[in-house]
Amino acid sequence: MAIEDLDDANHKIAIKYRDRIRTGDTPFRSLYISNYVIDEALTLLRIHCSHRVAVSFRKVLEASTLVKILWITETLEKAAWEIFEKHADKEFSFTDCTSFALMEAEAIRNVFTFDQHFSQYGFESVPQA
C-alpha cells in the first residue's frame, strides 16, 4: 500500500526499502503476499488512490519475479480464525490473522510492513518507520 500510495506517510521509506530488496541489499530475496492481502490492498488503493492504480498494482504483482502470491487455504483460514478469536485484546484484522497463520505455516519471521500488529504478534517488521 505504501509503495503505491504517493500520499502514504511511509511511501518514501517503502520505495527505498523495495529498491534495496531488488538490489539484494536486504536479507529478503523475494517477497510473499497472500490473496487476502491483495484483496485488502486492491480495495484500499481503489478508495484512496484510483481504480487505475489498483489495477496496475495487481498487474505488477502478477508479472513480478520478486513477489510470489501465496493462497490462504481452508486450513489456514481456520488457523486464522483461532488467532482472531484468541486475541480479543488486540485490534488485529482478520486479514492480519490470515497473514499470521500463513507466516507461521511457512516459517516466515520477517515482514515488510508498517502495520504494528505484526510486531505485536511476534514477527519482525522491516523497515522501521
Model-based region annotation:
Residues K12, K68-R109:
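Active-site neighborhoods of divalent-metal-dependent phosphate/nucleic-acid chemistry enzymes
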